[in-house]
Amino acid sequence: MMGSVVPLSSPAWDLNLSAGQNLLGHGSPTPSHSRKRRLSVTPEAGDSHMEHESPSKPRQQSPFVHKRARVTRQLQSRPLPMSRLLSSLDQKTLVSLLEGICAQDDRVARQVMEVTPKPTVSSAMDVLSRALDQAFALFPYKGDHQNDYAFFRVRPALEEFLAELSDYLSHFLPPNETQVSNSFAFLDQATSLVHRMPQWSSPANNRLKEETYEHIDVAWTLVCEEAAKRQRGSLAMSGVGNWLIRLEKHNELSGDRLKTSLHLLRDMLDDQGYRPPNPFASFNGAQQLFTV
């Protein structure tokens, strides 16, 4: 009588090497009745049967099966490494996450402040330029760009730009900034950004820009005074005269709103006998430097 067929079991993702060999054709399945008859043979008969059976080469397993087994066993569910996880976040989300962690632990906050590289003048200006560009992007497509409607659309982004400008301005002032040349360089480029701020038809709306000029004027004054202390009477020899040319042009573009710092720097250089080598050449050079 024929024996019953034994069903094959192959659950999902459970790799069985012998089953894989059968599927790939490396060995045919043994019929159930032949398998059952072999199991009933006595040990003596089995030895006799093996003596008469011709020897055969050992069956080779496919390297593909071995490779698939290794890959399947190495594929495991696991979370992303921290570097991959953080790289998937946009800058705003990453900053918010880091600020939240620092707010919960003062030691972590101090450590982050210690290990984070200080911004350069170039990197700071990149941030500020993007912030001002975002404000200009909020202008209405059509209509008057100087009326109250346009102002209230742009105002939140302008205030964010001014908040960032205030933070960076404080950072680049001495004594926090130890290099006076960096302070002058930042002020030069930051003042150019202030020139770009929108001009409104309403005087009340223009107060934002006017107040910003007032802060910039104070900053120029502080840096000029610090430069005078450090150079000890050698301002003309230290290249500060070049900043006078820039400040003169900035004052012109601002509508004479930087006159306090300009007069201070001019008086300090005059006391040391500084005179521009060629006023007309200096003016032309400043024209090229101040494209705003």
UniProtKB/Swiss-Prot annotation:
InterPro entries: Cut8/Sts1_fam, Cut8/Sts1_sf
Primary subcellular site in the record, as a coarse category: cytoplasm
Any one Gene Ontology cellular component term annotated for this protein: cytoplasm
Top-level taxon of origin: Eukaryota
GO molecular function, one term: proteasome binding
GO BP term, pick one: proteasome localization
Family stated for the protein in its record: Belongs to the cut8/STS1 family.
UniProt protein name: Tethering factor for nuclear proteasome STS1
Assembly and interaction partners: Binds the proteasome.
Pfam families: Cut8
Residue spans of biased composition, Basic and acidic residues class: 46-56
Protein transport listed as a keyword: yes
Its biological purpose: Involved in ubiquitin-mediated protein degradation. Regulatory factor in the ubiquitin/proteasome pathway that controls the turnover of proteasome substrates. Targets proteasomes to the nucleus and facilitates the degradation of nuclear proteins.
Source species of the chain: Yarrowia lipolytica (strain CLIB 122 / E 150)
Keyword match Metal-binding: no
Name of the gene this protein is made from: STS1
Subcellular location: Cytoplasm; Nucleus
Keywords, in A-Z order: Cytoplasm, Nucleus, Protein transport, Transport
UniProt region (Disordered), positions on chain: 24-68
Coiled coil: none
